[in-house]
């Protein structure tokens, strides 16, 4: 391979992964959230000028509904343009306040009123106005929406593409097993039109899956008569009738093939086919060669054939026979008598020319177009009396109007391609030349003028009959060329259009009033329906989902998810096996591995790494072009339809130095099959080996060595990993980790290059490079505020930590700060643990995991979870609830964490049951006598009339209070705590703005200094004309006096003026921004109706790993921690180092996930190399030797590896820094399907001076004895999953009971009990433990008196129980009584 040197960014230089990939990357990993971000950007077209907007998204929806005309046609409302305002609250404020992040949509509309009197449409007056149409949610830059304070993701939908589809019933409908073919035209919106055969080979049609009608009724409604229908669908044989006897047939020899004649077929005297013999293709050739044009046939050859047209007596005009009649002998005689010289018959046979339409016409009861329209009306609206107009309108509105029917550009393209037309454009309604030519409205005339003589409906029926005749194939609906992706933008547009259509109805009514009453557009349009539709979609649609925010990977995969469920999609119950299965077209488009287990398997998929959607919404995947066996670097994206025509080689096909394919036969894919082809026949080649898998699957090293089912679990479980306290990069990765972390948006990346000026835990300030500074007021300072200890949707902790130091030189895109689960800009979901595969006293039976106490001590798997607890004070019927520290019947001790407002302090450590917010609720009481009222008024006795309803820490939770927020309704006085929080928030914002301004100001002055020092001045404070400006002079001046300098040089004078303007502009801007922020902080909050005050308390809970927690590797090897063993008892190596985790070796063979073994070996080598580097650094080896050793690690097999690491780019200091970062282990990348080979792993182990078998002798920690054979030991990246025993374990003594049965509720959330089910009852019965059983079924469950009595007895210290009647027995008695059977218990 040629040497490919990559230049490393500031972040990458800190730690470089050794890459084992053999294929050089042609394409970088694309921006992973593009499908979301691009789709919504197209929907909004925010940055496009109104007159240049494309016909997409909001613009298209508004254009399709407007103009709205009144019923009389004298007034119309036209659409001019729209603009989006600025959002009121930014993302952070929306999250905090529970608001939705969006911007107001203002649409400019024009009301036009026409003059009634004039004959032409003269305009009376025009009024243009901006109308507010509600809030449009905005997407954050990470592809999410903030709805009511929570982040949500709109999942893309994979639905059936509009167009026409041909299918058969697989022989299931009829008992004979005959294939019944059908066609279906699916529009984007509008009625479905189906065509289908019945077992007797007649053709039927259905509209919207209703009752079926003969297809000829539909054609007749379009205006075709019997003769025209037959002419469209059949070829015609012409017979000339001889006056006395016999018939002459105009011969087309091909049409005789397969027939058996009962007379000799001769050319003159020469007999070509004898009577009774079947005519073959050879005979046909002979006939053609002989040039026989006509054939004399006997009369009975014509009898029984089907007439293609009506036969009329020329002299009298009498109808002798109808089209579609079978000719009888009598009719033939009548034809002769009337002197008919020629008749046409349909050419049909049983083999490949079926008489389908002819059969259909025989069962068609209608004769005229009107009858057909009425028949369709009756089918669509049964029970309504049809009138001519109603029938015509209904039929026209079904398929031929733009308001009711829309194929869409995709549908039209698919339709035209399927019926074999070349052009992909056309009308979005079904077009029929004959039908539209007979109508005489403007729209129909325009359509007829623009289009050729085509008929969409006829062509579909023709293709269907061709397929029935055995020519043509049915479609595969699971082919990705027949399923398209609907992303956020498109779904939002549809919802918006639905809202607008509702508005349209209301506007139409009011427009008639507008003429007389002079209403303005604002008064005409009520925006509520639009706002409601959008709010409903983003808030509660099946595809608008609560974002999975466990870790960065789960965010990215959630946004890249593609679901077949949802409105207009499939349902779980109805989806069969075929839809869920992997299809050949999934290759490179949809991941073949990552899909949920369970009822949704195969219905929810993930986009492949390089997949993208094309303009029609079909998924495409990139390929490299191959010309005459030479592979080029040109990349072309192909959709599943286009790919069908090409032969495509694998990414790992062997090539030589000139990029020529070297093998004699190359393994390829063609039309879904795998085959071998010579290099000259190959058209394309895969871009990358990981093209077939999704992001999550591409993160699994050695995926190629894992069984697919386990790989699926591995990909899915990575999404459940909880971010640990200190992230640790995987020693063995795949090289895509950096891209995932970058695109997930959890890290802070530099917007522009520059130098780090100032840094603390919460903020990074960058002084931008001169070259990247824009003009105007841009002062060349970027300020990044970091997110500190915030709660995610899954209650995990989001926290960002700076990676850079003051003075570091960074470039655009460099990682400045790590987020959760990232380590120096790489995704790091778990920890690298030292693992041994061996049994250990049964503690790793059935996939259990044995942990060392060292893991707990070092907090390797300690995670922080942030819980949000809310206390709401409402206005009740009996008076308002109050939040205060004055709570009746509560000890002082219980209140010691509350301040005087009754809210817990920040920093308080609380346990289950502690009061966090004191709240009292007025309680209802009996009517007081006047005397009592008087006493109460005098002494103000309050304690008795309120009850304690404080917010307490829920059971099983303890933690530290890290934040408190108090929200107060507008117009209610804020309490002391709320004012304190408000003041501190204003202070913080003020400091933030002051700091920002100071930094900007300093940057502007520093730039100005560099521009004027050493220049000649014309004068200034204490400066004579002609003096030079010096640094010392400037230091002695007040900053604001610099602007009084008068420079000789024009450029310097301009610089001073520009600096002054910049500072003034920034000062103004900061003042305005601060005033705005201050206003938002001090204003009252918008709370739900009836809520006076709301307090949110955030608790940080620290969870250490403990028995019962679920852990997993990346290969689907999951298990539950069974025990945590003291370090001294763990097995240890000869060096004395104990292992961290002991796994069961029996978990490997039957699961067939060998990837974990390879990972362990390579991980051990990586760690060993790190140790070696550490020893070199400690011994202070010469830098040149370190450089040589690193070169040996990175480039030892540069002959086959694609990427070379060029260490000459590194200065000695950078190299030492790199070495320091590698002490923990040299990270390796083994890309999916292109990873490290066994030989390479051995080579690495050898470099690290470790045994090449990957096994070593372990010793028992408790006895010190050596185990009897060597053990596989090494490092594996192991994850802790978000299934923690703390969240699941739960105990109850007494608690809530179900209303009817009086049995305890179930589940942790309801504080329920454990169900003692029927199997448990059987166990007690088998033991004969009668009293225990009685206790279980009565006092511990639903014997109300018994359980109360039992509680009293326990309190009184009497340990006895009396079982009474279980409530469920009473329920049973009542149920039996409801069946009118009385049942009474007698003493």
Curated annotation (Swiss-Prot):
One Pfam match, by short name?
RNA_pol_Rpb2_6
According to its UniProt record, the EC number is 2.7.7.6
Q: Which top EC class is given?
A: transferase
Q: Is DNA-binding one of the keywords?
A: no
Q: Name one GO molecular function term.
A: ribonucleoside binding
Q: Which InterPro entries match?
A: DNA-dir_RNA_pol_bsu_ext_1_sf, DNA-dir_RNA_pol_bsu_external_1, DNA-dir_RNA_pol_su2, DNA-dir_RNAP_su2_dom, DNA-dir_RNAP_su2_hyb_sf, RNA_pol_bsu_bac, RNA_pol_bsu_CS, RNA_pol_bsu_protrusion
Give UniProt keywords alphabetically.
Answer: DNA-directed RNA polymerase, Nucleotidyltransferase, Transcription, Transferase
Q: Which reaction equations make up its catalytic activity?
A: RNA(n) + a ribonucleoside 5'-triphosphate = RNA(n+1) + diphosphate
**Which domain of life does the protein's organism represent?**
Bacteria
Share an example GO biological-process annotation for this protein.
Answer: DNA-templated transcription
Keyword check for Coiled coil: no
**Gene Ontology CC entries for this record:** DNA-directed RNA polymerase complex
Function, as annotated, reads:
DNA-dependent RNA polymerase catalyzes the transcription of DNA into RNA using the four ribonucleoside triphosphates as substrates.
Q: How does it assemble?
A: The RNAP catalytic core consists of 2 alpha, 1 beta, 1 beta' and 1 omega subunit. When a sigma factor is associated with the core the holoenzyme is formed, which can initiate transcription.
Family, per the entry? Answer: Belongs to the RNA polymerase beta chain family.
Q: What is this protein called?
A: DNA-directed RNA polymerase subunit beta
Taxonomic lineage is: Bacteria, Pseudomonadati, Pseudomonadota, Gammaproteobacteria, Lysobacterales
Q: Which gene holds the coding sequence for this protein?
A: rpoB
């Amino acid at each position: 391979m040629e040497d490919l040197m990559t230049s490393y960014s500031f972040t990458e230089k800190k730690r470089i992964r050794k890459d084992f990939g053999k294929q050089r990357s042609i394409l970088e990993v694309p921006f992973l959230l593009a499908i979301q971000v691009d789709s919504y950007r197209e929907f909004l077209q925010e940055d496009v000028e109104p007159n240049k907007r494309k016909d997409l998204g909001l613009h298209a929806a508004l254009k399709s509904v407007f103009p709205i005309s009144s019923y009389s046609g004298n007034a119309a409302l036209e659409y001019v343009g729209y603009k989006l305002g600025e959002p009121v609250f930014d993302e952070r404020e929306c999250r905090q306040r529970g608001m939705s992040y969006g911007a107001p949509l203002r649409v400019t509309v024009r009301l036009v009123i026409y003059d009634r009197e004039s004959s032409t449409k003269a305009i009376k007056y025009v009024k243009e106005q901006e109308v507010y149409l509600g809030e449009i949610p905005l997407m954050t830059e990470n592809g999410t929406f903030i709805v009511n304070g929570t982040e949500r993701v709109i999942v893309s939908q994979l639905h059936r593409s509009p167009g026409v589809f041909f299918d058969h019933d697989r022989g299931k409908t009829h008992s004979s097993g005959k294939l019944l073919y059908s066609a279906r035209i699916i529009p984007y919106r509008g009625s479905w039109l189906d065509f289908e055969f019945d077992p007797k080979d007649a053709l039927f049609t259905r509209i919207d899956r209703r009752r079926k009608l003969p297809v000829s009724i539909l054609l007749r409604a379009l205006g075709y008569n019997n003769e025209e229908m037959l002419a469209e669908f059949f070829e015609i044989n012409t017979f000339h009738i001889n006056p006395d006897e016999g018939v002459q047939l105009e011969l087309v020899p091909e049409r005789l093939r397969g027939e058996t004649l009962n007379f000799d077929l001769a050319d003159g005297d020469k007999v070509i086919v004898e009577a009774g013999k079947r005519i073959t293709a050879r005979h046909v050739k002979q006939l053609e060669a002989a040039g026989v044009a006509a054939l004399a046939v006997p009369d009975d050859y014509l009898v029984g054939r089907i007439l293609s047209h009506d036969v009329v007596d020329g002299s009298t005009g009498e109808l002798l026979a109808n089209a579609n009649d079978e000719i009888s002998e009598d009719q033939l005689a009548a034809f002769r008598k009337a002197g008919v010289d020629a008749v046409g018959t349909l050419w049909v046979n049983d083999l490949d020319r079926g008489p389908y339409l002819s059969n259909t016409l025989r069962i068609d009861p209608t004769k005229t177009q009107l009858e057909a329209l009425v028949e369709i009306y009756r089918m669509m609206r049964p029970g309504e009396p049809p009138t001519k107009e109603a029938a015509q309108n209904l039929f026209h509105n079904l398929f031929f109007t733009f308001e009711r029917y829309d194929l869409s550009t995709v549908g039209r393209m698919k339709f035209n391609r399927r019926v074999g037309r070349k052009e992909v454009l056309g009308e979005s309604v079904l077009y029929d030349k004959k039908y539209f030519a007979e109508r005489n409205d403007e729209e129909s005339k325009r359509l007829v003028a623009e289009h050729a003589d085509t008929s969409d409906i006829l062509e579909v029926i023709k293709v269907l009959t061709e397929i029935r005749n055995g020519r043509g194939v049915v479609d595969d609906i699971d082919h990705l060329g027949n399923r398209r992706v609907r992303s956020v933008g498109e779904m939002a547009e549809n919802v918006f259009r639905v809202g607008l259509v509702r508005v349209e109805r209301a506007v139409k009514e009011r427009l008639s009033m507008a003429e007389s009453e002079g209403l303005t557009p604002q008064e005409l349009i009520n925006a509520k329906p639009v706002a409601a539709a959008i709010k409903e979609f983003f808030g509660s649609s099946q595809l608008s989902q609560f974002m999975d925010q466990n870790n960065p990977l789960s965010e990215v995969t959630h946004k890249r998810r593609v679901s077949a469920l949802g409105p207009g999609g499939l349902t779980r119950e109805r989806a069969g096996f075929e839809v869920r299965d992997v299809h050949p077209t999934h290759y490179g488009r949809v991941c073949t591995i990552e899909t949920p287990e369970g009822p949704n398997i195969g219905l929810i998929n993930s986009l492949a790494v390089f997949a993208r959607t094309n303009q029609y919404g079909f998924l495409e995947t990139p390929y490299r072009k191959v010309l005459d066996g030479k592979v080029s670097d040109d990349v072309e994206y192909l959709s599943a339809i286009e790919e069908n025509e090409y032969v495509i080689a694998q990414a790992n096909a062997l090539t030589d130095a000139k990029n020529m394919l070297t093998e004699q036969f190359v393994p390829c894919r063609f039309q879904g099959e795998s085959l071998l082809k010579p290099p000259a026949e190959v058209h394309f080649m895969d871009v990358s080996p990981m093209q077939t898998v999704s992001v999550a699957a591409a993160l699994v090293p050695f995926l190629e060595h894992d069984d697919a089912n386990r790989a699926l679990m591995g990909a899915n479980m990575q999404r459940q990993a909880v971010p640990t306290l200190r992230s640790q990069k995987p020693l063995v990765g795949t090289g895509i980790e950096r891209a995932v972390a970058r695109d997930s948006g959890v890290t802070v990346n530099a917007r522009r290059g520059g130098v780090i000026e100032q840094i603390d835990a919460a903020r990074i300030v960058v002084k931008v490079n001169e070259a990247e500074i824009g003009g105007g007021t841009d002062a060349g300072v970027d300020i990044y505020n970091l997110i500190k200890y915030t709660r995610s949707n899954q209650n995990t902790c989001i926290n960002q930590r700076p990676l850079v130091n003051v003075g570091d030189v960074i470039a655009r895109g460099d990682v400045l700060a790590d987020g959760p689960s990232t380590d120096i800009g790489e995704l790091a979901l778990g920890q690298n643990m030292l693992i041994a595969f061996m049994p250990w006293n049964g503690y790793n039976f059935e996939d259990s995991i044995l942990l060392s106490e060292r893991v707990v001590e070092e907090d390797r798997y300690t995670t922080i979870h942030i819980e949000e607890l809310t206390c709401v004070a409402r206005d009740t019927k009996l008076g308002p609830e109050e939040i205060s520290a004055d709570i009746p019947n509560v000890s002082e001790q219980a209140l010691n964490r509350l301040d005087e407002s009754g809210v817990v302090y920040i920093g308080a450590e609380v346990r289950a049951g502690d009061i966090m917010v004191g709240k009292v609720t007025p309680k209802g009481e009996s009517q007081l006598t006047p005397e009592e009222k008087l006493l109460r008024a005098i002494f103000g006795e309050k304690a008795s009339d309120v009850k304690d309803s404080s917010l307490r820490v829920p059971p099983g939770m303890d933690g530290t209070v890290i934040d408190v927020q108090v929200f107060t309704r507008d117009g209610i006085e804020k309490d002391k705590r709320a004012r304190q929080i408000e003041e501190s928030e204003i202070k913080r914002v003020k400091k933030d703005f002051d700091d920002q301004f100071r930094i900007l100001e300093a940057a502007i002055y520093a730039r100005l200094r560099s521009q004027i020092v050493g220049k000649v001045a014309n004068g200034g404070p204490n400066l004579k004309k002609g003096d030079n400006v010096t640094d010392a002079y400037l230091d002695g001046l007040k900053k604001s006096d610099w602007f009084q300098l008068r420079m000789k040089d024009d450029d310097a004078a301009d610089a001073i003026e520009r600096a002054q303007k910049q500072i003034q502009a920034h000062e103004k801007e900061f003042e305005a921004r601060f005033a705005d922020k201050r206003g938002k902080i001090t204003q009252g909050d918008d709370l739900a109706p009836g809520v006076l005050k709301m307090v949110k308390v955030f608790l940080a809970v620290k969870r250490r790993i403990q028995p019962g927690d679920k852990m997993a590797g990346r290969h689907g090897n999951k298990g539950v921690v069974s025990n945590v063993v003291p370090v001294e008892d763990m097995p240890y190596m000869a060096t004395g180092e104990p292992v961290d985790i002991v796994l069961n070796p029996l978990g490997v063979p039957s699961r067939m996930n060998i990837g974990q073994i390879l990972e362990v070996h390579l991980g051990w080598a990586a760690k060993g190399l790190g140790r070696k580097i550490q020893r070199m650094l400690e011994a202070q080896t010469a830098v040149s030797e370190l450089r040589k050793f690193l070169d040996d690690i990175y480039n030892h097999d540069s002959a086959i590896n694609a990427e070379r690491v060029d260490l000459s780019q590194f200065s000695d200091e950078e190299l030492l820094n790199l070495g320091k970062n590698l002490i923990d282990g040299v990270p390796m990348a083994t890309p999916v399907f292109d990873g490290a080979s066994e030989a390479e792993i051995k080579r690495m182990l050898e470099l690290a001076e470790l045994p090449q078998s990957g096994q070593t002798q372990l010793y028992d920690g408790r006895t010190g004895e050596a185990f009897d054979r060597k053990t596989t030991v090494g490092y594996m990246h192991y994850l802790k999953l978000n299934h923690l025993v703390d969240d699941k374990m739960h105990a109850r003594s007494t608690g809530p009971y179900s209303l009817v049965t009086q049995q305890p509720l179930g589940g942790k959330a309801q504080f329920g009990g454990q169900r003692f089910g029927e199997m448990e009852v059987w166990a007690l019965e088998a033991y004969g433990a009668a009293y225990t059983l009685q206790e279980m079924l009565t006092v511990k469950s639903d014997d109300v008196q018994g359980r109360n009595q039992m509680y009293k007895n326990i309190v009184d210290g009497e340990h006895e129980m009396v079982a009474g009647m279980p409530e469920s027995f009473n329920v049973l008695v009542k149920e039996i009584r409801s069946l009118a059977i009385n049942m009474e218990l007698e003493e």
